[in-house]
Amino acid sequence: VRRQRQMCIRDRIEETLRQGRQVLYLLPEIALTTQITERLKRVFGSRLGIYHSKFPDAERVEIWQKQLTEEGYDIILGVRSSVFLPFRNLGLVIVDEEHENTYKQQDPAPRYHARNAAIVLASMYGAKTLLGTATPSVETWQNATTGKFGWVELKERYKEIQLPEIIPVDIKELHRKKRMTGQFSPLLLQYCLLYTSPSPRDR
């Protein structure tokens, strides 16, 4: 599901850039920025800027000042503090894993929720907001089910990517027939061995 969501997000970013507008892409924690950065850099190159608190103050000031000019990044990927960066023409705000409590700034002041701040920021620019999650927060669920937010559910694989095969296993029945020797079914163990055993050319 996450891979589908990432592909959907990438398409929305491309669409926004074609309109000549900027994108703010928020992640709940710095640890996630590395893997997302690698993927986005391959597609968007130098149009992508990274911003978070692990950067030295001088580097963050440089990014801030660059965003005030025509040479500012088209895409900013960052954590909650990125909502305070200046933008010329913001067109899309993405809050990935919007349910995460790390979007809340508790200490030091100012105390704020980056997801909520991002929604307000988007409205100030007339930009779209995309909240991504497999497990919506109570507030987002309420807003989506009452029609305040639009709701897109990925029930099928995005762009016809093949679904994995799901095989139900009756554990109770296996216990009854005394075919369970541990925590895992014989079928699961069989597949584990199949995919972890070295191939003949690796031996």
Task: Give residue ranges: language-model regions.
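Single conserved hydrophobic/aromatic residue that forms the stacking wall/gate
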Residues: V1-R5, Y195-R203
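Walker A/P-loop NTP-binding motif
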Residues: R10-Q19
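Conserved Walker A/P-loop ATP-binding site and its immediately adjacent core
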Residues: Q22-E38
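Conserved helicase motor
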Residues: I30, I50-V61, V79-S82
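Conserved helix-turn-beta segment of the N-terminal RecA-like "Helicase ATP-binding" lobe
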Residues: Q35-P56
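Conserved motor-coupling elements within RecA-like helicase/translocase cores
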Residues: D57-I76
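Post-DEXD/H (motif II) to motif III coupling segment of the RecA-like Helicase ATP-binding lobe
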Residues: K104-I161
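Conserved interdomain linker/interface between the two RecA-like ATPase lobes of SF2 helicase motors
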Residues: K148-S197
